């Protein structure tokens, strides 16, 4: 065979190889590449969707946190207000109780003062009678002189 015939036969074999490759090899390779490209595109789309969902979820979390902080601040303020009210109520009760105790002590002191004065009057009257008895050198009868002794007590 000459170089021309070999070249012609090689060209025909090459053409058959190209046709065979285009007909049977190329379509599955292109299909696999297209499927892979589609999977990559779907993965990127899913990643973008997940990213947007994540940002939405983060916004919701921030809103919930802000809401929770606000609610906790309100509850804390309410608790402080209640505590202050309880403190004021306790102070008022303590003041009232202290006033009652002071009033009772004043009444008791007044009663003791009156009792002490009465006892002192009786003792002074008895001393006055004894003094008069000593002066007169005779016994003074308390039953007979009760009116006189009563006037002495009131004067003292």
UniProtKB/Swiss-Prot annotation:
Signal peptide bounds: none
Compartmental location: Cell inner membrane
Family the UniProt entry places it in: Belongs to the ATPase B chain family.
Lineage per the UniProt record: Bacteria, Pseudomonadati, Pseudomonadota, Betaproteobacteria, Burkholderiales
Coiled coil: none
Segments passing through the bilayer: 7-27
Top-level taxon of the source organism: Bacteria
Name the UniProt record assigns to this protein: ATP synthase subunit b
Subunit structure as annotated in this protein's UniProt entry: F-type ATPases have 2 components, F(1) - the catalytic core - and F(0) - the membrane proton channel. F(1) has five subunits: alpha(3), beta(3), gamma(1), delta(1), epsilon(1). F(0) has three main subunits: a(1), b(2) and c(10-14). The alpha and beta chains form an alternating ring which encloses part of the gamma chain. F(1) is attached to F(0) by a central stalk formed by the gamma and epsilon chains, while a peripheral stalk is formed by the delta and b chains.
UniProt entry keywords in alphabetical sequence: ATP synthesis, Cell inner membrane, Cell membrane, CF(0), Hydrogen ion transport, Ion transport, Membrane, Transmembrane, Transmembrane helix, Transport
């Amino acid at each position: 065979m000459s170089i021309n015939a070999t070249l012609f036969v090689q060209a025909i074999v090459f053409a058959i190889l190209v046709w065979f490759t285009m007909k049977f090899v190329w379509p599955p390779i292109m299909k696999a590449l297209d499927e892979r490209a589609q999977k990559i595109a779907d993965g990127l789309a899913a990643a973008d969707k997940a990213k947007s969902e994540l940002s939405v979820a983060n916004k919701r979390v921030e809103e919930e946190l802000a809401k929770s902080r606000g609610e906790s601040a309100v509850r804390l303020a309410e608790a402080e207000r209640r505590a202050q009210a309880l403190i004021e109520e306790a102070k008022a009760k303590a003041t009232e109780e202290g006033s009652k105790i002071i009033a009772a002590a004043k009444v008791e002191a007044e009663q003791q003062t009156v009792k002490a004065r009465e006892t002192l009057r009786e003792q002074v009257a008895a001393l006055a009678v004894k003094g008069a008895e000593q002066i007169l050198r005779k016994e003074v009868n308390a039953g007979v002189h009760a009116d006189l002794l009563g006037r002495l007590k009131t004067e003292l």
